[in-house]
Each structure stands twice: as C-alpha cells, then as structure tokens.
Amino acid sequence: FLPIIASVAAKVFSKIFCAISKKC
C-alpha cells in the first residue's frame, strides 16, 4: 500500500464528503 495512493484517496474522499455535506 503506497503512501501516494493513500494521499490521492484522501483527496478524493475529501471531495466526496464536501459534495455530500455541501460544506466546501
């Protein structure tokens, strides 16, 4: 499991959470 993948996944999750909660 690469740190780079974890970093990208965190950014993607952040965008998804932002879209769902609409608290950007």
From Swiss-Prot:
It is found in: Secreted. GO terms for biological process: defense response to bacterium; defense response to fungus; killing of cells of another organism. InterPro entries: Antimicrobial_frog_1. GO terms for cellular component: extracellular region. It comes from the Eukaryota. Its main location: secreted. Pfam families: Antimicrobial_1 (PF08018). Disulfide bonds join 18-24. Expressed by the skin glands. Belongs to the frog skin active peptide (FSAP) family. Brevinin subfamily. Antibacterial activity against Gram-positive bacterium S.aureus and Gram-negative bacterium E.coli. Has activity against C.albicans. This is Brevinin-1Pc. It comes from Lithobates pipiens.
